[in-house]
Regions:
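Residue-level detector of alpha-helix boundary/anchor positions
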Residues: 1-2, 197
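Short, low-complexity, charge-dense intrinsically disordered segments
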Residues: 2-32
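Conserved N-terminal alpha-helical segment that immediately precedes and caps sugar-phosphate-binding
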Residues: 23-24, 32-297
């Protein structure tokens, strides 16, 4: 900040004088300025999230295409395989099963890659981070299912650089299955792939969606704290998931196969909600039975 000095002040231009006066007299004592200086960090985070929303709005064509591909698979009696390791499992569970969602998905949640709530010790974070970079694990996971070209796949990975999601996308493509990758593009671009050939998840994707978060994911910088906090990829990822879900539900309904949407009893009544839950779970079981029936073929 330019410190006030009567002698030097005379030598400044008009605009420079205004800046010096503002910095030295108006800024320090103005309560409104002080309020801005102490801006609530939660408000700053929400502003960053608004920026993520804007980035997702720019991906309408990709969202529509993903919904169209998913609808084609579900209407043909097949499924959309959804996979994510680490925190990316959140997006898998957001797609199905939860309120506002419906059958047609194969949620692949491998506990060895995602159940690390203990952080340290048995089932800890170290093991999960190690396992998501074990080559060949993706093949072992997919060996459980009978895949079909009519399927589609959604692979979620913020960095797009870990081996298991990359190899899973590669295996799906080898089977002729279209792959949608949900990544954080800025983070992916600045990260190094764990594959020796340097290929990333997006190299095995037919369609790429961007969560809109920054490189490193965290969005808020705090004075005297070296590293930023409060990530944004989950916020963006969930908005993309539910945008696709809405478009997909419309397509299924327009095609004469309205989805069985898990709905709260407070919305449609306990009896009807229970009936829909049972019907939705049965449909899911029948679709999964087809996958298991043809495993290994």
């Amino acid at each position: 900040m330019e410190r006030f000095s009567p002698k030097s002040y005379k030598n400044l231009t008009g605009i420079q004088q205004i800046i010096v006066l503002f910095n030295n007299f108006i800024l320090p004592g103005n309560p409104w300025v002080k309020r801005l200086q102490k801006m609530n960090l939660s408000e700053e985070y929400l502003n960053k999230c608004q920026g993520i929303i804007n980035k997702i709005r720019e991906q309408q064509n990709q969202i529509q295409k993903a919904a169209e591909w998913f609808a084609t698979s579900i209407l043909s009696g097949r499924v959309v395989h959804v996979f994510g390791s680490g925190h990316s499992r959140i997006m898998v569970e957001e797609m199905w099963p939860r309120y506002g969602s419906f059958p047609g998905f194969n949620p692949i949640v491998e506990l060895s890659l995602t159940y690390h709530n203990n952080v340290a010790g048995a089932n800890g974070q170290r093991q999960a981070m190690y396992l998501e970079n074990v080559s060949g694990l993706a093949e072992r996971i997919l060996r459980n299912f009978g895949l079909d070209k009519k399927d589609t796949a959604l692979i979620v990975s913020s960095s797009g650089c870990n081996l298991v999601p990359i190899e899973m996308a590669e295996l799906f493509q080898e089977k002729g299955i279209r792959v949608v990758a949900l990544v954080t593009k800025e983070h992916l671009d600045k990260s190094k792939s764990k594959r020796t050939d340097g290929k990333k998840l997006t190299d095995f994707a037919d369609l790429v969606l961007d969560s809109g978060a920054p490189a490193g994911d965290s969005m808020i910088k705090i004075d005297n704290l070296e590293t930023p906090v409060s990530p944004g990829s989950t916020v963006g990822g969930i908005m993309i998931i539910n945008s696709i879900k809405a478009e997909l539900a419309k397509r299924l309904t327009d095609a004469g196969q309205p989805p069985k949407v898990l709905t709260a009893a407070c919305v449609i009544g306990a009896e009807k909600a229970a009936a829909i839950f049972e019907a939705a779970y049965d449909e899911h079981a029948h679709r999964m039975a087809e996958l298991y029936k043809n495993a290994g073929k």
